[in-house]
A protein has these predicted regions:
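Aromatic-residue detector
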Residues: 7, 66-70, 76, 80, ...
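Nucleotide-sugar donor-binding patch of glycosyltransferase catalytic domains
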Residues: 43, 53-57, 88-158, 162, ...
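Short, conserved glycine- and acidic-residue-centered signature motifs
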Residues: 6-9, 139
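Donor-binding and catalytic core of enzymes assembling or modifying cell-surface/extracellular glycoconjugates
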Residues: 9-99
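Short acidic, gly/pro-rich beta-turn/loop elements at beta-sheet edges
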Residues: 6, 39, 135
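Conserved donor-binding/catalytic core segment of Leloir-type glycosyltransferases
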Residues: 1-3
């Protein structure tokens, strides 16, 4: 695990999750067992009816299973992480959050990507923990910015098809088809 300087805030993931669930999506939270606390935080931020459509898979899947799930996800919203690169390799649309790191050095290898970062003096610092203690490089990447980026990649509006499968309406991230790690 790199450290929290690459981890988009759980409340931001929760906000994006809530809005997508409201549009008929399912959300899969993915990552290692070390991401359990973040996944729990995301779930706590959701109202009870939304939690029924948000699945915490952190620490519950093998890498092969995570790859299988991401291969059928509609999109992935993720930190700069290993699973984000896997999603890109699978050809899934990816919204990638870059905090302390830089896409100039570790870009996802896909053309179906929206790279999100902000231009502040201390970024990129490439540190595992924010040396200034504020994590503005991630905190200031708003959920609205992520949703706008996602909408440039896929239709995020509710599906009108009856009987569409869960896989057809899924969002992915490491924290998801939200990715954490």
């Amino acid at each position: 695990e790199f450290g929290d300087a690459k981890q988009w805030p759980a409340q931001h993931y929760a906000s994006v999750s809530s809005q997508l669930i409201g549009k008929g999506w399912q959300v899969w939270i993915m990552g290692s067992g070390k991401d359990n606390d973040v996944a729990s935080h995301i779930l706590r931020e959701l109202v009870e009816s939304e939690r029924e459509h948000c699945y915490d898979l952190t620490g519950k899947t093998s890498l092969a299973q995570a790859i299988d799930l991401m291969s059928v996800a509609k999109a992935v919203v993720s930190n700069d992480s290993g699973l984000m690169h896997v999603a890109a390799a699978l050809g899934r649309p990816v919204v990638a959050m870059y905090g302390s790191s830089s896409a100039d050095f570790t870009p996802p290898l896909t053309d179906q990507v929206q790279l999100l970062s902000i231009d502040i003096d201390c970024r990129p610092c490439f540190e595992r923990v924010c040396p200034l203690g504020h994590k503005r490089c991630l905190v200031d990447l708003s959920p609205e910015l992520a949703l706008s980026a996602l909408a440039r990649l896929v239709n995020i509006e509710q599906s009108t098809q009856e009987g569409s499968s869960a896989a057809d309406e899924s969002s992915a991230g490491e924290h998801g088809t939200f990715c954490e790690s």
